[in-house]
């Protein structure tokens, strides 16, 4: 096979709607171009610098066909590795290389991986409101669209900030009360089950807002409402506590969106301390490690629910679909509808049909970027308020 030489690499940051989105574009001597998602929206320009200043000089002139070798070279070339900036940069290139390989083979990625395990992957979306009535409206809107798995949040991630017992002059931040959050969320589960019964599966994201002892209490109390899963009940640094939760509650646990390093998930999977791994594909380094993670999890009965928030390009979301269609232990896929300008920049973006995401049949990833449209929406950086999370006394806490 003749080599496919990398002739240029671009890294484009665009903000068509609320979020800064990072896309890597790899050009080759065969006039085949690949696209990848490298979005780390809190630090987009750091990722761009990594691609432009370090990965591009390393890769120009090399054969794009050798994805495995190039992935390892990109990962170890800086010596220090497995952080969010380098992983996202590597992932953007890695996805683009897989996109090129699929286009050269005239195959969609899931065929290149080995074919499909299912007809479609069930999707879930987010219903959130500050009031129960508002939450009911959101639930019914999503149910009417065909969703039978709905993530429900009352007061988003922390209850009612207006009801906090605050200090005299609170430091700036996004405040929440853990006890109030637990009480409100358990009341939400009870109300949803009383109103809707088992018409749909309820998912919920704790977003690592609890102390370990509170997480144990919450997992025990919420079990009676049969959630599909409870997400990120603890921050990664406290995951040793998952064994305590596991021994006292049968509630399904999901975690992984903050993981960057294989050491963060290996013991959790081997010891079966979680039911679902939901890593963010670009945060772990792209398609190449995601395929290996999927196979590793299958050996231990752990299922996959890839992270797919709004601050992610439709290219990255399409990669998730290909992984889900192929990997036997894929369970469900998070999805949030794209705003209008995002669809202009990514015109091939895929949406669910009646609660399912179906295989993409175009060669490669099957979703690209309109570069002219993207350049109409330059990067706009702002400090992120929601990641400045504080307890009522002003103490910083994991967001």
Swiss-Prot record:
Has UniProt tagged this entry with the keyword Iron-sulfur?
no
Which residues are Mg(2+)-binding? 205, 231, 257
Single GO MF descriptor: magnesium ion binding
One GO BP on record is:
amino acid catabolic process
Family matches, as CDD domains = RspA (cd03322)
| Key words of the record | Magnesium, Metal-binding
Q: Which SUPFAM superfamilies match?
A: Enolase C-terminal domain-like, Enolase N-terminal domain-like
Record's signal peptide: none
| Residues that coordinate or bind D-arabinonate | 207, 257, 278, 307, 334
One matching Pfam family is MR_MLE_N
Q: What does this protein do?
A: Has no detectable activity with D-mannonate and with a panel of 70 other acid sugars (in vitro), in spite of the conservation of the residues that are expected to be important for catalytic activity and cofactor binding. May have evolved a divergent function.
Q: Which family does it belong to?
A: Belongs to the mandelate racemase/muconate lactonizing enzyme family. GalD subfamily.
Q: Which PANTHER family match?
A: D-GALACTONATE DEHYDRATASE-RELATED, STARVATION-SENSING PROTEIN RSPA
- What is the protein's given name? D-galactonate dehydratase family member ECA0189
